[in-house]
UniProtKB/Swiss-Prot annotation:
Keywords: ATP-binding, Cytoplasm, Developmental protein, Helicase, Hydrolase, Nucleotide-binding, RNA-mediated gene silencing
Any Gene Ontology CC annotation: neuronal cell body
Gene that produces this protein: armi
Lineage: Eukaryota, Metazoa, Ecdysozoa, Arthropoda, Hexapoda
Database matches in Pfam families: AAA_11, AAA_12, MOV-10_beta-barrel, Mov-10_helical
UniProt name for this protein: Probable RNA helicase armi
Length: 1188
């Protein structure tokens, strides 16, 4: 040892380095002092001049010194020292550095007092800790004296430590052992012991959990990834948390509950007072684990639905005893409840063959038989059951553990399989047995027909609605204005209507009770019933929204802090419906409080931001500042502002516009036209001046529509621009706007749309026209659009939000962002532009700004068919009856507005104002009166006919089926981009087929299977998923890009299955979505998956307008999206029952464009009746000039 130490006395280089380092430190200190003295002198001479220089120099000097200090005082060092003490599991180095002997790892047995060792330290704050004893540099002699050890310690004090940089990194691991205050974690760097008292964590770890450790690590260039030793573990998290996963209780043990084949929860993690039983449905926060057969562990649950011990499987088993419509009936007991462990009991069941042929029971399979308490006694061999006869099956139950379990078994017949379950409950006492029996009886009553989960959710919604507690309001997004020009009424839902909707057990009973209580529902809609009917329909829609919002409620939840906000994690928030938006609220309630108590209070949290998987809230300061991670019960509420605006409009519109506007029965001409223009050929003149068209590519029908609107000869009646798919509705609307602004100086126009995307499109088209200056028009947006960053950058400088505060009643706080977005504009800044574009309900913000009558002169709607009538009335109510004009542009034969309440939809709420008007006499088709305008009165309606979207062989389908065979194709079937693309893509079909060169519609017949998962009411068809995927691959091989393809299917489950197929195979995914997602869009190639293959399910679709079959509007949208090619995948035997689908299939058959399974007989019998040529679908054109 002394040989090693002596080196430090004979090393002149090392002494020289130490001297030079000391001189450097002294020089730096002296330089700093000299600088300070110089600054003091200059400051005394000229204090004003030196001020700025002084602060800059001091800052530079301080920065340089701090950098020097940091580099010299790294928290991780490698040092050399002498072991001065060893006592069991602890030791001391250099008399003052304590360490645990386990940090020596492999060399622990070689450690002795007097050894010179190299060790790694990590300093946090004032404390230095030995992380690892790396090696023994010099072993000690047995007769080494204490004096010699002290001398070696003194000599080593001059040894310069090696400094290492540190970094925070994540290390993944698996907990192998859980002790009282520590865990052992297996990592790729070896076993690591983590003291739980010294780290941050968000869950209680246990054996088998997969975890992520946030560690400070040593950066060592000796390793490839530069990671040396793990110095300190600071945080412990699960590798992943899946929040809000729906799980069903499958087994209940003494210490744990099984929530699925791979999921469990420890009973210690259950909320206090929660007792789970078989069949209970819970929302669980799951983490990854590796424990026995389980891969997921629930760390927190929220009970969602109590089933008291019965499951849908056991209910199915008991229901099977009725035998109604079943091939095999299973009768007998389906549960066994006892208080004895290791008891054996035989149970017998009877199997009845309900078919008219003999069945063979080949075997009985007990699922998971190694753990099951159920075993088969007889029959052990195959056995035949003749038609109408029965056999006995005997099982033995052997109770093996306390708790509840579902034992599954399968009856394997020669033609089918019958799955059944048996419930086994083992209790501790006979009293518990009696309680379990009561629970099972209650469960069967609860799951009886007529009390499904949807009806139970309504009962819960009623409880929430009836809970009246004091609410302490949260912090508003913007300051609530005390003075506004017009205050909207509250328009609360009547108590009696709420009681009917939320307490009726069956829908038919609900409808009957509503009609009895509100007798005007049985009368036709008229000016007398108008306000009452639509107010009721709005209330029904609000009630349904309230019920749907209960899906967000939680029995237990906690918040996390994020700056000035409290945040709440919500899994899959972006995909959930109804959506949460800024301004919605939630209320937090103490879960232990008595809801009936007068002292119970709740705090309101207002949503200020909505992110991908969490929301940011602000509460009253008394809650926000003191919150410390406690759990609360949460109830969510939507903002009623939109409903209130619609109620206000409905209550005023009758008085503002009158019966002639709402229920037109005749066309009355004005004394003078709105604008005295006239048409000569395709040119428009005002007086003797020719008016230039902004868009020179408009066809003659579009120009005529603009002319009719400008003249505005009809008195107080809406003008309808009827535009089939691809006919240029928006293009015509833009031209109308520009002509109104140029030729009517007093015009101030509102443009209303059903969605933000369509409002953005109108804004972009106006910008692209370059006909108006910035400031002539404005795009009114909501705060929700701003906060979610949903405004396209190219229109940002044209957008603004409004402030409803009365002018002069509050400080003007309008702000303009760097992008040009104007925020919080009061009436003096907004509402005075020539054109204001927004969604219908956002335009309703102007209702409270107090504009005088006649302030707005025109309201134009784009996609008016997708607006409900109350939404349409919101901007119209700001007009006056005289000298105003309303234009409705849309297609009533495409999808309607989305209405969540089925009852309201059935009562006409989903019918748009546009669609209702077309049933009135002035808008009806009369070819005899108006032969030159497709049979419509040009004073009130123009139907656009030229189709710019699709090849004739695609357009002809929806033209014939939905538009009286009147549409005129503009695209050439011989010389157009689409026709050349179609010609290139013919390679994806069978070469021997004699398909007409210009034919772009194809049908692929598949006898598939529609399936439905237990956790979703939506449907999917795996055979169609496969064929659609293979066709997409074939198109890619033909050099088609993903943005040229669209895949449409009516069911969300099929959408998910298709997306999973592309993601799982790492193939570029085209746009895949429902019909609603494709309305207003187009693609070169459209693939349609119809999904359904069951007649029984088709009957249900017809009732609820699901799928494509017998829902003409959905079919119309689906088949009108393609430009060059459309391929439909479906079951022709089922689709052909519908007349529209049969015509489409026949069209493909006659053009040799049908592939796949055999055709149904009804199509074969009829195919000779359908002409092969396309002329039956496309109007003949006399000259090519008509297309120009």
């Amino acid at each position: 040892m002394f040989t090693y130490v002596s080196k430090f006395f004979t090393n002149p280089d090392r002494n020289r380095e130490d001297i030079l380092e000391s001189l450097d430190r002294e020089n730096s200190f002296l330089d700093q002092k000299l600088m300070e003295e110089k600054m003091d002198q200059q400051l005394k001479a000229n204090p004003n001049e030196i001020n700025g220089v002084l602060s800059n120099k001091i800052a530079e000097l301080t920065h340089g010194l701090s950098e020097m200090d940091v580099s010299k005082e790294s928290s991780c060092t490698a040092r050399k020292g002498v072991i001065t003490s060893l006592d069991g599991d602890r030791g001391v180095i250099d008399k003052d550095v304590l360490f645990e002997t386990k940090v020596a790892e492999d060399i622990i047995l070689d450690l002795h007092v007097g050894c010179v060792v190299e060790y790694l330290t990590f300093t946090t704050g004032e404390a230095m800790r030995v992380v690892k004893v790396k090696s023994i540099l010099e072993h000690s002699w047995e007769d080494t004296s204490q004096k010699e050890i002290e001398k070696a310690v003194d000599n080593l004090k001059n040894e310069k430590p090696t400094f290492f940089n540190t970094e925070t990194r994540s290390v993944l691991g698996l907990i192998s052992q859980r002790l009282a205050s520590s865990i052992d974690v297996e990592t790729e760097y070896g076993q690591l012991t983590v003291e739980l008292d010294n780290i941050e964590m968000n869950f209680i770890p246990t054996n088998g959990d997969r975890v992520r450790l946030e560690c400070n690590i040593q950066l060592d260039d000796g390793f490839v990834d530069k990671q040396g030793e793990i110095l300190e573990v600071t945080k412990l998290f699960p590798t992943r948390i899946q929040e809000g996963e729906k799980c069903i209780v499958e087994r209940v043990y003494v210490h744990m509950v099984v929530l699925g084949p791979e999921t469990y929860i420890l009973k210690t993690d259950l909320p206090t007072g929660t007792d789970l039983h078989l069949g209970d449905i819970v929302l669980a926060d799951l983490i990854e684990c590796q424990y026995s057969k389980f891969t997921r562990r629930a760390i927190k649950i929220t009970p969602l639905e109590k089933n008291f011990g019965a499951t849908k499987l056991t209910q199915q088993s008991s229901m099977g005893s009725s035998g109604s419509g079943k091939a095999v009936t299973v009768t007998g007991v389906n549960r066994f409840i006892t208080a004895e462990l290791w008891q054996k009991e035989s149970v017998s069941l009877k199997l009845t063959n309900n078919l008219n042929r003999t069945l063979r029971l080949e075997s009985i399979t007990v699922c998971n038989d190694s753990e099951s308490q159920l075993s088969v006694v007889s029959p052990l061999e195959s056995k035949e059951i003749s038609s109408g006869s029965e056999i006995t099956v005997t099982f033995e139950i052997h109770t093996q553990f306390l708790g509840e379990a579902i034992e599954k078994y399968v009856l394997n017949f020669d033609l089918l399989k019958v799955r059944r379950v048996f419930t086994v409950i083992v209790c501790k006492t006979k009293e518990e047995v009696a309680e379990a029996e009561k629970r099972m009886i209650a469960a069967e009553a609860l799951m009886a027909p007529g009390r499904n989960s949807q009806e139970r959710s309504r009962f819960y919604a009623n409880q929430v609605w009836c809970n009246k507690v004091d609410v302490i309001p949260g912090q508003q997004i913007v300051t609530k204005r005390r003075f506004v020009a017009l205050r909207l009424g509250c328009f609360e839902v009547p108590k009696e209507l709420r009681q009917i909707c939320l307490t009726s057990e069956r829908r038919q009973e609900m409808i009957k009770a509503i009609e009895q209580h509100y007798s005007f529902l049985t009368e036709p809609l008229s000016i007398k019933t108008y306000m009452h009917r639509f107010r009721l329909l709005l209330h029904l829609e609000e009630i349904e929204c309230f019920v749907n919002f209960r899906n967000y409620d939680r029995d237990r939840a906690h918040f996390l802090r994020d700056g000035e906000f409290l945040t709440l994690q919500i899994e899959n928030l972006a995909e959930r419906r109804p959506s949460l938006v800024i301004g919605d609220t939630l209320r937090v309630i103490n879960p232990w409080s008595d809801p009936d108590s007068q002292t119970t209070k709740s705090y309101e949290g207002i949503i200020h931001k909505v992110l991908f998987d969490r929301i940011l809230l602000k509460f009253h300061s008394s809650f926000q500042e003191k919150y410390n991670g406690e759990d609360y019960r949460l109830e969510f509420y939507f903002s009623r502002y939109s409903f209130r605006k619609q109620h206000h409009a409905i209550s005023k519109i009758v008085g503002v516009m009158g019966e002639d506007f709402l229920f037109p029965s005749k066309v009355t001409k004005r004394e003078n036209p709105q604008l005295d223009v006239y048409m000569k050929d395709d040119d428009m003149y005002l007086y003797d001046s020719k008016l230039e068209w902004y868009n020179q590519s408009l066809n003659s029908i579009q120009k005529r529509a603009v002319f009719n609107i400008l003249r505005g000869e009809a008195e107080n009646i809406p003008y309808v621009l009827f535009g089939p798919p691809g006919s240029g509705k928006t293009m015509t609307l833009i031209e109308t706007l520009l002509q109104l602004v140029r030729n009517l100086p007093g015009a101030r126009i509102l443009v209303g749309t059903p969605s933000n995307s369509s409002a953005d499109l109108v804004t972009k088209r106006l910008i692209d026209s370059k006909a108006l200056l910035q400031g002539d028009f404005i795009r009114l947006v909501s705060y929700n659009q701003v906060e979610k960053d949903l405004i396209p950058p190219e229109i940002m400088s044209y957008c603004a939000t409004s402030d409803v505060g009365a002018v002069g009643s509050c400080e003007d706080k309008m702000m303009v962002t760097e992008s040009g977005l104007k925020l919080r504009c009061q009436a003096k800044f907004i509402g005075t532009h020539r054109i204001t574009i927004s969604t219908c309900t956002t335009l309703g913000n102007f209702l409270q700004l107090g504009f005088p009558a006649g302030h707005f002169t025109h309201v134009l709607f784009d996609e008016a068919g997708q607006c409900t009538e109350p939404e349409t009335m919101v901007p119209i109510v700001m007009l006056t009856k005289k000298r105003s004009q309303v234009v409705l542009s849309g297609d009533p034969r495409q999808l309607q507005s989305i209405v969540t309440s089925r009852i309201a939809s059935k009562m006409g709420f989903s019918i748009s104002f546009l669609e209702r008007l077309l049933e009135r006499s002035p808008y009806r088709k009369d070819l005899q009166r108006f032969p030159e305008s497709s049979g419509y009165n040009p004073l009130v309606l123009t139907k656009l006919l030229y189709n710019y979207r699709a090849l004739p062989s695609i357009m002809s389908i929806y033209s014939r089926l939905f538009y009286d065979d009147e549409l005129i194709p503009v695209l050439s079937e011989k010389d157009s981009r689409e026709s050349r693309l179609l010609s290139k893509l013919r390679c994806v079909f069978e070469s021997e087929k004699d398909i007409p060169q210009a034919h772009g519609t194809f049908f692929y017949g598949i006898i598939g299977e529609n399936r439905q998962n237990n956790d979703s009411p939506s449907w999917f068809n795996p055979q169609e998923v496969r064929e659609v995927f293979l066709m997409t691959i074939a198109l890619y091989r033909a050099n088609v890009t993903a943005d040229q393809i669209g895949i449409i299917t009516p069911y969300q489950k099929q959408v998910k299955m298709l997306r999973s197929m592309f993601i799982g195979t790492d193939v570029v995914m085209p746009k895949i979505g429902s019909v609603e997602e494709f309305q207003g869009q187009e693609r070169d190639i459209i693939l349609i998956s119809t999904v359904r293959s069951s007649e029984e399910i088709l009957r249900m679709d017809a009732r609820f307008s699901l799928g494509f079959v017998r829902c003409s509007k959905r079919l119309n949208v689906a088949v009108s999206r393609a430009r060059a090619m459309m391929i439909i995948f479906g079951n022709p035997h089922l689709l052909a029952v519908d007349e529209c689908w049969r015509q489409l299939i026949l069209f493909c058959v006659k053009n040799n464009a049908y592939f796949g399974c055999d055709l149904p007989q009804m199509v074969i019998n009829q195919k000779d009746e359908v002409p092969v040529c396309l002329e039956t679908f496309v109007p003949s054109l006399n000259t090519t000039d008509d297309l120009n």
